[in-house]
Amino acid sequence: MKPIWDKGKPVNDLIQRYTVGLDREMDMYLAKYDVMGSLAHITMLESIGLLEKEELVALSAELKNLLDLIEEDNFVIEDGVEDVHSQVELMLTRKLGDMGKKIHSGRSRNDQVLVDLKLFTRDKLRGVVNSVKALFDILIKQSNRYKDVLLPGYTHLQIAMPSSFGLWFGAYAEALADDMLFLRAAFEQSNRNPLGSAAGYGSSFPLNRQLTTNLLGFESMNYNVVYAQMTRGKLERNVAYALATVAATLSRLAFDACMYNSQNFGFIKLPDDCTTGSSIMPHKKNPDVFELTRAKCNRLQALPQEITLMTNNLPSGYFRDMQLVKEVFIPAFDMLEDCITMVAYMLEHITVKEDILSDSKYDAIFSVEEVNRLALEGVPFREAYKQVGASIENGTFVPNKEINHTHQGSIGNLCNDMIVSKMEQILKEFPFETIDEAINRLTSK
């Protein structure tokens, strides 16, 4: 199969195989978005007189048939075809003859893959947003459920001050609310139309870029055609930072869960069917889900650096280096969603231990409570600190285990309603409905 850039000269199969690499495999993830981009592009071409009305009707019908093939998992990129763009054009040409060759007017594979990646990223980010919200809801539910169950708080892995499961679950809920800000920023960058930038320098055709922006439900466009091409690599890196931010939260939570589940802590218990065993030690119940989540999320945190190293120090314009970014960027969404889903499942099924702080080994954790009590009675804080410290050293410290924390965000005043409000406000800023309406209009038969 000759490439679409064929000039009548022999193609070196070795070079072809090396330069195509895994692109065909990665492009299968982009197939439906490539067809959507083509639907918008041909609608625009007809509006400026580069296609006849009947040609638009015929091409649109065939492109929508291709969408059906993709949805049914019956679409393939044939052997010898370089990429999804070439496959779509080939199938249209087979069906409609020379009419199929007209769809590339005013377009390059450079802006074609850009719009594919923007649409793909926008869609996949939506999936991550929904998964994060589902995990957030579980964390808030568990925080409210166990708000009165106390837990040791640690600094330097030394027992420090009283905490609670309400605080622990709620802390990660609020962390996800902040992480959602990064996802919102990443979504906004992916929601700008690059189509019409062609190879990176525009076109002499009178392209109507606002029309394709509207048809694809983009919020705006990358106006400068050179910059539109410069977003390749930059978009992926910035989105990767957003994914890595969520991954960092999950990794930290996973470490806590592994530690709290161990016999030396015993703060939480996982159901037997959520653990794995040992081939030699019959007593083992290992938290492998959290361990694998920690490793996968640490791997995801390296993604921005990996993309940076592939794209750093490139001048403006397109370079083939960008092709390799797809291989690490595209799979990252499913990896993160898998981690979020598994963490949510585990947290829904854990059991927390009651009365942890009744154990005498945690008596010193109430030392600050005693210092504060003395300070409230008029003893200077530093003197109260010394008195309590001395009683701990000489073994005479008797803790008062009543907790009275009432300020915002403390054990007795979790402010979960405010955290929920923060999350809901951020979620309102995602224009999902507007996008759905545009895509449904574009793709409906």
Mark where each language-model region is.
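Generic, well-ordered alpha-helical scaffold segments in large soluble proteins
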Residues: 41, 62, 66-69, 91, ...
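Charged, flexible cofactor/metal-binding loops and thiol motifs
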Residues: 118-125, 129-130, 144, 152, ...
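Short, well-ordered beta-strand elements within core beta-sheets of diverse protein domains
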Residues: 43-51, 167, 237-245, 369-377
